[in-house]
């Protein structure tokens, strides 16, 4: 079967070979898609995103269950809504140094994801970005980040200004400077067996520990 090709941005071309390897080349912004609506479908096994691409369009790789790892280049500034939603086989993702925003449900349902490092440029992590990622073992934030932190290597993402823990994982140790646990912070964290909530926490938002079974 010959490789398939098309456009996925005004100046971006996609090519899919017969082994399921997708390559995106070009510059500028990607098109947005509906859930599972991207032209390459859900059967891709790898994706290579070239330097020069500035964002990853909505739902671009949603429910691509065979993807196991992704490297997002340093030219990318935005990961939009639902980009990797439902990619259950995704284990590792490298988020490029220029990414400033991670959209809603961007990695929601990535049940195989093991670790996430938030780079220094990230200013916005939207709701449910890492919802239902039950296998996460490691969550860290670059020490130069001005908005989020993972103080004391706590294995969590904390909104610095409000001392709100927004995402945790099975290895999280909640620091005694955290005052609030955000909505869905540990939702579907099925590997979680126990957690100590320090006295500093005065507010636990709805759904913080939903479906931790």
What are these model-predicted stretches?
Residues 1-3, 210-213:
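Short intrinsically disordered, low-complexity coil segments enriched in acidic
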Residues 2-36:
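Extracellular, modular beta-sheet/disulfide-rich ectodomains of secreted and cell-surface proteins
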Residues 2-5, 86, 112:
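Positively charged, low-complexity intrinsically disordered regions
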Residues 17-28, 42-55, 65-78, 88-101, ...:
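Structural signature of tandem-repeat unit edges
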Residues 57-60, 80-85, 103-106, 127-129, ...:
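Consensus positions within tandem repeat domains that build extended binding/scaffold surfaces
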């Amino acid at each position: 079967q010959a490789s398939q090709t098309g456009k996925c941005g005004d100046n971006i071309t996609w090519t899919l070979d017969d082994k399921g390897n997708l390559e995106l080349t070009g510059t500028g912004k990607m098109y947005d898609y509906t859930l599972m609506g991207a032209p390459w479908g859900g059967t891709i096994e790898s994706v290579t995103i070239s330097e020069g691409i500035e964002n990853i369009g909505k739902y671009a790789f949603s429910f691509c269950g065979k993807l196991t790892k992704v490297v997002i280049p340093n030219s990318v500034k935005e990961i939009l809504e639902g980009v990797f939603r439902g990619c259950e086989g995704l284990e590792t993702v490298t988020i490029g140094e220029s990414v400033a925003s991670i959209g809603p449900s961007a990695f929601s349902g990535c049940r195989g994801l093991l670790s996430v490092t938030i780079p220094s440029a990230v200013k916005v992590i939207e709701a449910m970005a890492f919802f239902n990622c039950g296998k996460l073992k490691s969550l860290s934030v670059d020490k130069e980040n001005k908005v989020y932190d993972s103080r004391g290597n706590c294995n969590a993402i904390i909104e610095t200004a409000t001392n709100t823990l927004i995402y945790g994982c099975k290895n999280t140790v909640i620091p005694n400077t955290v005052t609030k646990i955000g909505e869905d912070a540990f939702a579907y964290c099925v590997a979680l067996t126990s957690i100590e909530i320090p006295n500093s926490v005065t507010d636990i938002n709805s759904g913080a520990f939903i479906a931790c079974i």
